[in-house]
Amino acid sequence: MAASSWLRAVLLFLCASDLLLLSPPEAYATDTPGEAITPPRKKKDIRDYNDADMARLLEQWEKDDDIEEGDLPEHKRPSAPIDFSKLDPGKPESILKMTKKGKTLMMFVTISGNPTEKETEEITSLWQGSLFNANYDVQRFIVGSDRAIFMLRDGSYAWEIKDFLVNQDRCAEVTLEGQMYPGKGGGSKEKNKTKPEKGKKKEGDPKPRASKEDNRAGSRREDL
């Protein structure tokens, strides 16, 4: 009896050890029959990351995190809904304002009076400061001796800024969405062109010549 009980204990121990050594069936089971089991991917050291790895990591973070609409790139932001009840068919600018809401927009500004690049920098800086005080977020870039770009993050305010610029004394012209708007200082070049024309007319006018001949005839009579 003692020997048989001892033998049973040894057999139970061997069976238990075999069960422990066997891997679980989940390790070999797959969702689809015949699919090969891929070993787990070895984790890469972050010190060995290249630009492609960093881009994938950033993309994964963007998927996992909830990013606000204002922080998204412009091409990924949802378009603002358009309230057609507020549109005026007689004013095309009102339609453009609604469609450009929340989108970046640029306008070109030309300075009158043949300024230097430094003068253009100073003049446009004053305009930018006035717009900033009126709560308009505008960025400014000088692209020539008499030309600058005003860039807005919200294009719906572009036409209000255009109205401000064209009323400035040194603003010759504003170009917005392919449309050219003459400024208050746009007539300076035309005035400069008309001045020599007036001078030429005076020189070619026959009346002054007739008056000179009359003066000569009068002087001859006095001599006689």
Curated annotation (Swiss-Prot):
Pfam family, one: Mesd
Principal cellular location given in the protein's record: endoplasmic reticulum
Residue span of region Disordered: 178-224
Basic and acidic residues composition-biased segments: 187-224
Protein keywords: Chaperone, Endoplasmic reticulum, Glycoprotein, Signal, Wnt signaling pathway
Segments of this protein annotated with the region Escort domain: 156-195
Superkingdom classification of source: Eukaryota
Signal peptide: 1-29
GO biological process: ossification; phagocytosis; positive regulation of skeletal muscle acetylcholine-gated channel clustering; protein folding; protein localization to cell surface; Wnt signaling pathway
Subunit record text: Monomer. Interacts with LRP5; the interaction prevents LRP5 from forming aggregates and chaperones LRP6 to the plasma membrane. Interacts with LRP6; the interaction prevents LRP6 from forming aggregates and chaperones LRP6 to the plasma membrane. Interacts with LRP4; the interaction promotes glycosylation of LRP4 and its cell-surface expression.
Role played: Chaperone specifically assisting the folding of beta-propeller/EGF modules within the family of low-density lipoprotein receptors (LDLRs). Acts as a modulator of the Wnt pathway through chaperoning the coreceptors of the canonical Wnt pathway, LRP5 and LRP6, to the plasma membrane. Essential for specification of embryonic polarity and mesoderm induction. Plays an essential role in neuromuscular junction (NMJ) formation by promoting cell-surface expression of LRP4. May regulate phagocytosis of apoptotic retinal pigment epithelium (RPE) cells.
Name this protein carries in UniProt: LRP chaperone MESD
Protein species of origin: Rattus norvegicus (Rat)
Top-level taxonomy: Eukaryota, Metazoa, Chordata, Craniata, Vertebrata
